[in-house]
């Protein structure tokens, strides 16, 4: 029998806040924050090298029924498909957008897998979106 990688949950506010300081990966269906844990953090949390995931669905997405449906769809997509792409000793926080409710399940799993495996991708090759002016004399002085 094939052993599945156990994916643990983020439950405490402090855990969510530390992941928030990590790398952000934006997509049309959700925003994903990713942070690698140090060995000390993994030992302190007694999680080993298992990946952990937390879900956030804000009230602007709808009432409790809609928010829970979005959360359940994301959990199932992680459990069935995208969980195998998760790196060990890494925490993920998924902030759902309203479009995650009506998107086809195949698109949801594909988008999750793409965002999980993307490491440090930037649109413009690492350059800033807006260029800063060169430092120089002020008012011709």
Swiss-Prot record:
GO molecular function: 3'-tRNA processing endoribonuclease activity; ribonuclease P activity; tRNA binding
Group of enzyme by EC: hydrolase
UniProt EC number: 3.1.26.5
Biased composition (Basic and acidic residues): 114-124
Subunit structure: Consists of a catalytic RNA component (M1 or rnpB) and a protein subunit.
Enzymatic reactions: Endonucleolytic cleavage of RNA, removing 5'-extranucleotides from tRNA precursor
UniProt name for this protein: Ribonuclease P protein component
GO biological process terms held by the UniProt record: tRNA 5'-leader removal
NCBIfam families documented for this protein: rnpA
Region of interest (Disordered), residue spans: 37-56, 114-141
Keywords, sorted A to Z: Endonuclease, Hydrolase, Nuclease, RNA-binding, tRNA processing
InterPro entries: Ribosomal_Su5_D2-typ_SF, Ribsml_uS5_D2-typ_fold_subgr, RNase_P, RNase_P_CS
UniProt signal peptide: none
The gene coding this protein: rnpA
Positions of disulphide bridges: none
Family under the similarity heading: Belongs to the RnpA family.
Lineage, broadest ranks: Bacteria, Pseudomonadati, Pseudomonadota, Alphaproteobacteria, Hyphomicrobiales
Biological role stated in the UniProt entry: RNaseP catalyzes the removal of the 5'-leader sequence from pre-tRNA to produce the mature 5'-terminus. It can also cleave other RNA substrates such as 4.5S RNA. The protein component plays an auxiliary but essential role in vivo by binding to the 5'-leader sequence and broadening the substrate specificity of the ribozyme.
GO cellular component, as recorded: ribonuclease P complex
